[in-house]
Amino acid sequence: MIDRLAMIGVNVKTASREHVARLEKEWEKHLDTIGYASRGTVIIATCNRFEVYLDSPSRLVEDLASSIASPGGEGLVRLQGIDAARHLFRVASGLESQIIGDHEVLGQVRRAWLKSREKGFTTPLLDEVFHRALKTGARVRSESAISSGGVGYSSAAVSLAASLLGGGLDGARVGIVGAGMAAVGIARALCTRWRPRVVAVFNRTPERGWEVAGKCRGVESLVLPLDELAKLINELDALFVAIAGSTNILERGRVERGVSPRVIVDISNPPVTPKVAGRVFHMPEVEEEAKRMMEERLRWIPAAEAIIEEELEALLDALSRRRARESSRSVMRALSILAEREYERTLAGLRNGVDPREAVELALNSYTKKVGGALRRLLEEASDRGQLSLEDIEAILVSEFARIAENSGFKNGSTG
């Protein structure tokens, strides 16, 4: 059953970002075009990848899916069966992301699957595969540290300060200078991982400062003009700086003489604080921390891959059980038709005066011989071939029962 699964796609490693972005922009159009022509389709479309997952692709569907290749047909990735499933599980687990352990991709996989289900484009095979992929992605994140923390400079700045303070940032008095994306990232990383006592945001325009403070819900927050920093700096345990400009906002002597803040991390480019050993840290130290955090994630790749292989085995078991149930239903339908024919023959015999007991015995004997004949043919095939797949067994039994049922006529009231 897994052999029916296929993936055709491109990503930023095999095609240009511009090409992937164009495909992402029109992904719903591609989903409708391929979805209505195929047995089953799910398309994962992000800024990094455009991948079409198919159940039993036909030549037409393959041609449609191949249209996503870059000009010249380059960059197209094709995977089949268990390889396609393994790739999807790696995507959901964040192992194929630009940033290993990426959090967002799991939600992107979920939304892609749900969109196809909403349009009626999924099949039991695709539903099982995507359900297992989401479970795998969740397991990898909960049973490993591959997604712990962030790996951007904002997250690295927070991680560096927490390690330098020794006990982390719970209960700390924290200042953030700036209101741009980097400052927002610092606030998000800070209040996602830690629970500071108070967060004070200093900015030239306090209105924008509330965008930063808003990332620390449930924490006492202050937004103050930048010129208030000099008055309050000694009350802070840690200070983060992320602003544009080249003018120092703190005097070296003040930093060297002061007891607080114990740690200042400045990710501004260029830095706007004086470098003071052991107290003030700039981008080189933050870059080292980001590198360390990424290396920590990379250490968890073998554990993540082991989980993926476990879940692939579970997927194959689930698909095997599903296929067995489908085969069982198919064989039972064929048996029901055969039983119905015997029932009709028995009724005809009774109407023609056959003794009821004799009619039942004849019907049972006839049914047993016919089922036994089908089983005998199955055993002969197994002996000749040496091994039969589930599909072979189903095909032999269903075709044999259908042939017997077709030939089960009756003459002159005979039930034999």
UniProtKB/Swiss-Prot annotation:
Substrate binds at residues 46-49, 97, 102-104, 108. It catalyses: (S)-4-amino-5-oxopentanoate + tRNA(Glu) + NADP(+) = L-glutamyl-tRNA(Glu) + NADPH + H(+). The keyword NADP applies. The keyword Nucleotidyltransferase does not apply. Pfam families: GlutR_dimer (PF00745), GlutR_N (PF05201), Shikimate_DH (PF01488). Pathway: Porphyrin-containing compound metabolism; protoporphyrin-IX biosynthesis; 5-aminolevulinate from L-glutamyl-tRNA(Glu): step 1/2. NADP(+) binds at residues 178-183. It comes from the Archaea. GO terms for molecular function: glutamyl-tRNA reductase activity; NADP binding. Keywords: NADP, Oxidoreductase, Porphyrin biosynthesis. PROSITE patterns: GLUTR. Belongs to the glutamyl-tRNA reductase family. During catalysis, the active site Cys acts as a nucleophile attacking the alpha-carbonyl group of tRNA-bound glutamate with the formation of a thioester intermediate between enzyme and glutamate, and the concomitant release of tRNA(Glu). The thioester intermediate is finally reduced by direct hydride transfer from NADPH, to form the product GSA. This is Glutamyl-tRNA reductase. It comes from Aeropyrum pernix (strain ATCC 700893 / DSM 11879 / JCM 9820 / NBRC 100138 / K1).
